[in-house]
Amino acid sequence: MCDIKLIVGLANPGAEYAQTRHNAGAWYVEELARIANVSLAPDPKYFGLTARAILCGKDVRLLIPSTFMNLSGKSVAALANFFRIEPEQILVAHDELDMEPGVARFKLGGGHGGHNGLKDIIAKMGNNKNFYRLRIGIGHPGDKNKVSGYVLGKAPATEQEKMNAAIDEAVRSTEILFKQDMTKAMHRLHSFKAE
């Protein structure tokens, strides 16, 4: 059985960033909140937007840090420490340059892959990397010098539709994760690709 107690969607705060590729993790958490019929509300104690949701009968905290991306760990650690949630009970959703739009993957552990949000979470959790990730493909601009502008830019409509489809499939796979296990959830999600 899955023991996820905290689901985090990484993002930059503010309306100007809401539709940028870097906020893909937040889109996933917003969709989970919508399905659970709960509202994400600002909570200064945890430096983010939070909600308590029942997903497939499981009591889960949802969190979108309202720090900037490179300070995400401050928010995640504050909530995890308060509720005594272990890294292995956390799922962090984030944008992934190394996967094309329309693809999403679950993963346990590993490095930060240059993602500043993951980097800060690992640092603030005492270098513990053993949390789950949901990697949401956003594609790569093809030149590492263009990455910053790319992740902070909006995707064209065709790419956005593919990302939305992958997020919808990730939500369905999350339900399998809670009802069954991570292996079955991975099997479902990893065989999906939006055309």
Swiss-Prot record:
Catalytic residue positions: H22
GO molecular function per UniProt: peptidyl-tRNA hydrolase activity; tRNA binding
GO cellular component: cytoplasm
Keyword flag Flavoprotein: no
Residues of the site described as Discriminates between blocked and unblocked aminoacyl-tRNA: N12
Reactions mediated catalytically: an N-acyl-L-alpha-aminoacyl-tRNA + H2O = an N-acyl-L-amino acid + a tRNA + H(+)
EC nos: 3.1.1.29
UniProt-listed GO biological process terms: protein quality control for misfolded or incompletely synthesized proteins; rescue of stalled ribosome
Residue positions binding tRNA: Y17, F68, N70, N116
InterPro entries per UniProt: Pept_tRNA_hydro, Pept_tRNA_hydro_CS, Pept_tRNA_hydro_sf
UniProt-annotated location(s): Cytoplasm
CDD domains recorded: PTH
Keywords from the UniProt entry: Cytoplasm, Hydrolase, RNA-binding, tRNA-binding
Subunit structure, interactors included: Monomer.
Family designation: Belongs to the PTH family.
Function description: Hydrolyzes ribosome-free peptidyl-tRNAs (with 1 or more amino acids incorporated), which drop off the ribosome during protein synthesis, or as a result of ribosome stalling. Catalyzes the release of premature peptidyl moieties from peptidyl-tRNA molecules trapped in stalled 50S ribosomal subunits, and thus maintains levels of free tRNAs and 50S ribosomes.
Protein name listed in UniProt: Peptidyl-tRNA hydrolase
Protein encoded by which gene: pth
